[in-house]
Amino acid sequence: MSKRIEVYFVPADGREPAEVLAAKAKRAYVATGFNERIAEGDFAALKVHFGESGNTGHVKPGWLAGLIGEIGQRTKHAFLTDSNTLYVGNRSNSIDHLRLAWSHGFTPEATGLPVIIADGLIGRDKREPRSAQARTSSSKIAAAILDADALVGLTHVTGHVQTGLGAAIKNVGMGCASRAGKLEQHSVTHPRID
C-alpha cells in the first residue's frame, strides 16, 4: 500500500486583501511543520514565479509576508528565487529578470528578502546530480537551488499546453531547472491528441 500524502488546502481568492491571503498562506505553511526543519543559518529558497511583463496572474509579494516572517524566525538567510526561461523575453537573463521581479514588487524593501536568480546571469549556472532512482540518470538543476538547505515552493495555478495544468510540480520541476534542463525537458515530450 502506498504512503498516504497529506494535502493542505486553504480556500483563497485573489480579490481578498493581501493581509488575509498572507495569513492564510502562513496557516497552511505552519500546518505542514516544515518550518521546524529549517535550522539557524540555513539557506532557505522561496521558489516563486515573478510573473511576466503585463501579467497579473502570479503570487503577489504581499501574500508572502506570513511565510517570510515564519521562515525569518528560523534563519536570516532566506531568499526569493526563480530560474531564467528558455524562451527569449524579460526572464531569459538575470538582469531583465530582476528588473521584472522588482517591477512586480519583489524588492528587498517590500519583502525583506533578496532575489537570487538561481541559474546565474544567462542560465548556465547548473549542476547535474545523478540518481539511480529517477526517470533520468541526471538532471540539470539551477546551482542556487542545490546550494539551498531548504526549498519552499509558492505557486499559482495556470493552464499549460503540454500538461493541461501548471502548478506546484511545474514550479519546481521546470522552475528549478537551468536553461539546459528546460531544453532537455521540452525536447523529449511532444503533445498528442487522441
Features from the language model and the residues they span:
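N-terminal and secondary-structure boundary signal
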Residues: 1-194
